[in-house]
Swiss-Prot record:
Produces ATP from ADP in the presence of a proton gradient across the membrane. HAMAP family: ATP_synth_D_arch. It comes from Anaeromyxobacter sp. (strain Fw109-5). One of its GO terms (biological process) is proton motive force-driven plasma membrane ATP synthesis. Pfam families: ATP-synt_D. InterPro entries: V_ATPase_D. Belongs to the V-ATPase D subunit family. The keyword Transcription does not apply. It comes from the Bacteria. This is V-type ATP synthase subunit D. One of its GO terms (molecular function) is ATP binding. Keywords: ATP synthesis, Hydrogen ion transport, Ion transport, Transport.
Length: 215
């Protein structure tokens, strides 16, 4: 830290900087509390989403196994090729206390039987159910992915905010307090020296006046 001049203006400057640092730490703590609340809420959503994804995937795998047994591997592979498609994703960024957090959005992924690139009659009931369950699993997966991206970003920002709070409270504020104390002690010592000099001056003044009155 740059050494501040040992003056009353310097003391006011250091105290002002300490006040700003203290207010900054309080604001950062408030920010961290908001982010922590958002993190806790999002964590519960992600855990619930993962449980839902596990449930949906188990159903999808079971439905696919049944479709393979009833309709055959080749028939399923043929209709699956015609059902292939690209899924357009929209990635946007929103801010929570100034923290940019990504969000992923996709259109509805579960399609009707006649929207999978071939005649509905090409699909057996088991194959149709397997396709629907896998499309549902993809929808759930994308929702979780968006929330997990948000969760990771919030965690990073909370850590960064904690580091800034620690720097202010453990480094900046103690240094400013020490500097303020140094200047204040120096000014008090200077004031005491001025008082002593003034007393000496006043003590010598009568003697000088008496000497001046002598013939």
């Amino acid at each position: 830290m740059t050494r501040t001049p040992t003056t009353r203006m310097g003391l006011l400057e250091v105290r002002g900087r300490a006040d700003v640092a203290s207010k900054g730490a309080r604001l950062l703590r408030a920010k961290r509390e908001v982010l922590a609340g958002e993190l806790w809420k999002l964590t519960r959503e992600v855990l619930a989403g993962r449980a839902r994804l596990d449930e949906v995937l188990r159903g999808a795998v079971k439905a696919l196994g049944l479709a393979r047994a009833l309709e055959g591997e080749e028939a399923l592979a043929s209709v699956a090729l015609t059902a292939a498609r690209e899924v357009p994703l929209q990635v946007s960024v929103r801010r929570v206390w100034g923290v940019p957090t990504p969000s992923v959005a996709a259109p509805a992924l579960i399609r009707a039987a006649d929207e999978r690139g071939s005649s509905p009659t090409s699909w057996g009931l088991a194959g149709t159910e397997a396709a629907r369950r896998h499309e549902e699993a993809l929808e759930v997966l994308l929702r979780i992915a968006s929330r997990e991206l948000h969760l990771a970003r919030l965690g990073e920002e909370i850590q960064a905010t904690s580091r800034r709070i620690n720097a202010l409270e453990q480094l900046v504020l103690p240094a400013l307090t020490a500097e303020s104390g140094r200047i204040e002690a120096a000014l008090e010592e200077r004031d005491r020296e001025d008082v002593v000099r003034l007393k000496r001056f006043r003590a010598r003044r009568p003697r000088r006046e008496a000497s001046a009155r002598r013939p």
